[in-house]
């Protein structure tokens, strides 16, 4: 039906007869001529319908926006005075010699010229995706997927599929369960990742594996998360963590160069401890110049217990952010920032305006200045390199609360005060994560997953002091988003059993849940390491949007619902009976 795409017409085709299929983007009647802006996935071209072509002209009079049509015609070069520089096809137009209305359209539930609610856009997603902005995003995502496959194929990786119906394993989030009709009362789990299967592939001798794969997590959603998401899953044998990072960094570097013509340069490497200390986050946005500065040692002897308490607590932290020019912030603005850090558990936000740096204590304005002597104030000013006109914002509490609250405040200040360079790209690697983290009740949990290898420790050493262990893990971060994470894996049964034991998984449970893995580790398992990228997140960054739903053709809402199909929905009672499942809702308790 079609010989060319609308958006691909140019002067080199002048004089040729072409056939185009697409949609009416706009219709105009001017000076007896009808002009149709015709659109397909590649762009828009202007079609001219001459009244001398009576049958075509009569049909063109019936056209309305979003009619699906086919035009046949001659490509003509526009006069210089009529060139439209705002269109990629603006140097040419199509002189119509044939027109077919393939399908008419009713009035649209979306208005392409206005901002529509996200609910409407998701309900009528098939129409929303016709918008050039959305179409361009989906196409760029497709190009990214194609690039990944080409790059990994060229680097000797094998594309191998792993099961979707599998066994539930503890990987940090709830599983989506699928009941078995054959094995009544038993359930499959949809994979949160192909983690164990890709490790088994390494044990099978396939030393370079990849897969672009759907994964599923039943967790609370955010703007950059979905219940089903796509991973670029990678695993290797006989490569160190440095070598895995080198390959995957080249993949992203070359992707940005090919798709955006952006040179990312070499990615800096930062330890987890440094990232938390300087930025309050293990995924720092390095485009933002603000940093956290620790000052606990300066405050140990002050009488103000809000500062002295955390300063003398080994699990406490006192850190500040110096905001250049921030002395101009109003009290109302500062109070709003105080409410903001409260979201993260902070009890308040102390502040100090530096009106005259040279005057020391006498030159600052602060509700807490009366609790501090001149030496302490001068020490804070010196350490933060404060200047006249700056403001210093204080966080004092348990270390995790201060890091999270002040890290989030740093991002907000960078956005609000336009300190973050939104046009820049700032990738980095974060390495040497803690092996375990506490849950608040003294129990240890794997920070990544329980198959991650500790860094430079034997199984016996790990058992002696697990809380002090670091893992051979690494995350790739771009502009404050974790786009990929990986690690060296445990490749012997002794270490894997030790890690399970530290996590409170008893021997019987180990066999029930991971017996197949522990058995496989007995048979010459090679050292192996890997990484998984979030394709949705990579596409989000490539497209310059902050909402992951913008780069997924048919996404779910933050309530994990599909407004287009009304999924999830109640199951047919007969289907439930066949599965031996009864649905019972918890009874509401009286207030």
Swiss-Prot record:
Top-rank lineage group of the source organism: Bacteria
Region spans: Aspartate: 195-198
One of the record's GO cellular component terms: cytoplasm
E.C. code: 6.1.1.12
Catalyzed reactions: tRNA(Asp) + L-aspartate + ATP = L-aspartyl-tRNA(Asp) + AMP + diphosphate
Subcellular location field: Cytoplasm
Principal subcellular localization: cytoplasm
Positions that bind L-aspartate: 171, 217, 448, 489
Keyword Acyltransferase among UniProt keywords: no
Binding site for ATP: 217-219, 226, 482, 534-537
Cross-referenced InterPro entries: Aa-tRNA-synt_II, aa-tRNA-synth_II, aa-tRNA-synth_II/BPL/LPL, Asp-tRNA-ligase_1, Asp-tRNA-ligase_1_N, Asp/Asn-tRNA-synth_IIb, AspRS_core, GAD-like_sf
One record GO biological process: aspartyl-tRNA aminoacylation
GO terms of molecular function: aspartate-tRNA ligase activity; ATP binding; nucleic acid binding
Keywords, sorted A to Z: Aminoacyl-tRNA synthetase, ATP-binding, Cytoplasm, Ligase, Nucleotide-binding, Protein biosynthesis
One Pfam short name: tRNA_anti-codon
Coiled coil (residue ranges): none
Function, in words: Catalyzes the attachment of L-aspartate to tRNA(Asp) in a two-step reaction: L-aspartate is first activated by ATP to form Asp-AMP and then transferred to the acceptor end of tRNA(Asp).
Family the entry assigns: Belongs to the class-II aminoacyl-tRNA synthetase family. Type 1 subfamily.
Subunit structure, as described in the record: Homodimer.
PANTHER family, per the entry: ASPARTATE--TRNA LIGASE, MITOCHONDRIAL (PTHR22594:SF5), ASPARTYL/LYSYL-TRNA SYNTHETASE (PTHR22594)
Protein name: Aspartate--tRNA ligase
Lineage: Bacteria, Pseudomonadati, Pseudomonadota, Gammaproteobacteria, Vibrionales
Gene it is expressed from: aspS
């Amino acid at each position: 039906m079609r010989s060319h795409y609308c958006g691909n017409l140019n002067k080199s085709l002048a004089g040729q007869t072409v056939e185009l299929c697409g949609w009416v983007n706009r219709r105009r009647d001017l000076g007896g001529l009808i002009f149709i802006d015709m659109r397909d996935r590649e762009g828009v071209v202007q079609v001219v319908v001459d009244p001398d072509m009576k049958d075509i002209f009569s049909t063109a009079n019936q056209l309305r926006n979003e009619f699906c049509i086919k035009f046949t015609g001659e490509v003509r070069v526009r006069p210089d005075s009529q060139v439209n520089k705002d269109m990629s096809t603006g140097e040419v137009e199509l002189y119509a010699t044939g027109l077919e209305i393939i399908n008419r359209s009713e009035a649209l539930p979306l208005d392409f010229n206005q901002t529509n609610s996200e609910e409407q856009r998701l309900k009528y997603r098939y129409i929303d995706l016709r918008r050039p902005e959305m179409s361009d995003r989906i196409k760029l995502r497709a190009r990214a997927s194609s690039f990944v496959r080409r790059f990994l194929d060229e680097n000797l990786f094998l594309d191998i599929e792993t099961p979707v119906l599998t066994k539930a394993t503890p990987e940090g989030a709830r599983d989506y369960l699928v009941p078995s009709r054959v094995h009544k009362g038993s359930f499959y789990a949809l994979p949160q990742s192909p983690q164990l299967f890709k490790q088994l592939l390494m044990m099978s001798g396939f030393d370079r594996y990849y897969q672009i794969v759907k994964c599923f997590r039943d967790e609370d959603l955010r703007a950059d998360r979905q219940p089903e998401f796509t991973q670029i899953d990678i695993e290797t044998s006989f490569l160190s963590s440095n070598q895995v990072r080198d390959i995957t960094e080249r993949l992203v570097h070359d992707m940005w160069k090919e798709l955006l013509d952006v040179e990312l340069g070499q990615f800096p490497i930062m330890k987890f401890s440094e990232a938390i200390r300087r930025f309050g986050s293990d995924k720092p946005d390095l485009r933002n110049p603000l940093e956290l500065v620790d000052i606990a040692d300066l405050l140990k002897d002050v009488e103000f217990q809000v500062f002295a308490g955390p300063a003398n607590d080994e699990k406490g932290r006192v850190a500040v952010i110096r905001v250049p020019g921030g002395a101009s912030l109003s009290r109302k603005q500062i109070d709003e920032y105080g409410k903001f850090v409260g979201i993260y558990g902070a009890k308040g936000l102390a502040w100090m305006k530096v009106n005259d740096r040279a005057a020391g204590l006498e030159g600052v304005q602060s509700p807490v200045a009366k609790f501090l002597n001149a030496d302490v104030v001068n020490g804070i000013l010196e350490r933060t390199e404060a200047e006249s006109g700056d403001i210093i914002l204080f966080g004092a509490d348990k270390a995790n609360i201060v890091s999270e609250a002040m890290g989030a405040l740093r991002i907000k200040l960078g956005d609000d005060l336009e300190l973050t360079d939104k046009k820049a790209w700032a990738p980095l690697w974060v390495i040497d994560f803690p092996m375990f983290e506490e849950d608040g009740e003294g129990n240890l949990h794997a920070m990544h997953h329980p198959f991650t290898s500790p860094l430079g420790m034997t199984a016996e050493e790990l058992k002696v002091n697990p809380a002090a262990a670091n893992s051979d893990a690494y995350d790739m971060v771009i502009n404050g988003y974790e786009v990929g994470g990986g690690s060296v894996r445990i490749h012997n049964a002794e270490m894997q059993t030790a890690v399970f034991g530290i996590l409170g998984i008893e021997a019987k449970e180990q066999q029930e849940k991971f017996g197949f893995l522990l058995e496989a580790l007995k048979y010459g398992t090679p050292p192996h390491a890997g990484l998984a990228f979030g394709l949705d997140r990579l596409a989000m960054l490539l497209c310059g949007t902050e909402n992951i739903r913008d780069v997924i053709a048919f996404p779910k809402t933050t309530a994990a619902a599909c407004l287009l199909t009304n999924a999830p929905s109640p199951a047919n009672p007969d289907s439930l009976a066949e599965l031996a499942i009864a649905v019972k809702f918890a009874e509401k308790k009286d207030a």
